[in-house]
Amino acid sequence: MVHAIFCAHGQLAGAMLDSVCMVYGEVNVSAVAFVPGENAADIAINLEKLVSAHTDEEWVIAVDLQCGSPWNAAAGLAMRHPQIRVISGLSLPLALELVDNQHTLSADDLCQHLQAIASQCCVVWQQPETVEEEF
């Protein structure tokens, strides 16, 4: 099983976890918020506390956007802990897919899967074409 952390700006990570729990019930995911007044070092400390409980196991840290403070903190942690993977683009469809597969895929396979399906997580509704019937 891959352990997972949602980490994002503001209260997004906690709200994402709440939303995932509405769908699946209790899940093996933690949330780390990045709030005003904090920096990447503060986030890294919070992430390290979670990861330190299972340092020999695989982790995926899903962040909201690449190159933001959550990404920088998670990537810095991943550089020191080779069992950690970091993926950006946290959204509810991606979060649900992560939880769906964290028990069956390795961290590498899980990240590859999430990256492969990412474009399916954003769909534009289009007005159906109307066809006039001929009588």
UniProtKB/Swiss-Prot annotation:
The keyword Transferase applies. GO terms for cellular component: cytoplasm; membrane. The active site is at residue 9. Its main location: cytoplasm. It is found in: Cytoplasm. Residues 1-131 form the PTS EIIA type-4 domain. GO terms for molecular function: kinase activity; phosphotransferase activity, alcohol group as acceptor. Keywords: Cytoplasm, Kinase, Phosphoprotein, Phosphotransferase system, Sugar transport, Transferase, Transport. The modification Phosphohistidine is found at residue 9. One of its GO terms (biological process) is phosphoenolpyruvate-dependent sugar phosphotransferase system. InterPro entries: Bacterial_PTS_sugar_comp (IPR051471), PTS_EIIA_man (IPR013789), PTS_EIIA_man-typ (IPR004701), PTS_EIIA_man-typ_sf (IPR036662), PTS_IIA_man (IPR033887). The keyword Transcription regulation does not apply. Induction: By L-sorbose. The EIIA type-4 domain is phosphorylated by phospho-HPr on a histidyl residue. Then, it transfers the phosphoryl group to the EIIB type-4 domain. The phosphoenolpyruvate-dependent sugar phosphotransferase system (PTS), a major carbohydrate active transport system, catalyzes the phosphorylation of incoming sugar substrates concomitant with their translocation across the cell membrane. The enzyme II SorABFM PTS system is involved in L-sorbose transport. NCBIfam families: EIIA-man. This is PTS system sorbose-specific EIIA component. It comes from Klebsiella pneumoniae.
